[in-house]
């Protein structure tokens, strides 16, 4: 199981909200078209389709925290010395782009959720609920794999017993 926090989705999220980042990437001009976001969504769908065809299960979670809850968590991080490390002043600056981020999230979820690589939008104001919802989705995905421990044939069992005998005689 691999977990990516944002990953390649940054290119259709932060870069979309802050288009100056796109300009600073120094991409060839022919790649920056009016269709750049749709092209990037298509690239993401194709990449995840490739992963699916190679046996990788891709599930994605958007932890939907309300603006009010985010504010409360920021204040808690400021007030609690053990959580100060979690807070950055840039968090408040980015909060000013809330509506832009919500639009970007809506577009990326709408354009990159597929049957084989779905997005799960998780209400995340309640951390316990969010954790249960995520765990449930992961368990369901694992169950659908119908995984079983490998079995060994009689020849392998005999080989293991012979090795065990050698080890016991040391």
Predicted regions and their residues:
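Flexible, compositionally biased loop and terminal segments
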Residues: 1-170
């Amino acid at each position: 199981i691999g977990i990516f926090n944002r990953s390649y989705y940054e290119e259709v999220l932060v870069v979309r909200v802050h288009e100056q980042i796109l300009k600073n990437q120094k991409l060839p001009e022919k790649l920056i078209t009016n269709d750049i976001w749709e092209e990037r969504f298509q690239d993401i769908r194709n990449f995840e389709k490739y992963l699916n065809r190679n046996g990788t299960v891709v599930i994605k979670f958007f932890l939907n925290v309300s603006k009010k809850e985010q504010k409360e968590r920021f204040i808690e991080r400021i007030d609690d010395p053990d959580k100060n490390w979690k807070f950055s002043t840039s968090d408040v600056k980015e909060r000013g782009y809330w509506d832009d981020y919500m639009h970007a999230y809506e577009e990326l979820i709408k354009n990159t959720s597929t049957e084989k690589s779905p997005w799960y939008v998780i209400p995340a104001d309640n951390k316990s609920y969010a954790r249960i919802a995520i765990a449930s989705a992961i368990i369901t995905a694992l169950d659908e794999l119908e995984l079983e421990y490998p079995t060994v044939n009689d020849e392998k069992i005999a080989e293991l017993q012979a090795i065990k005998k050698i080890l016991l005689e040391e």
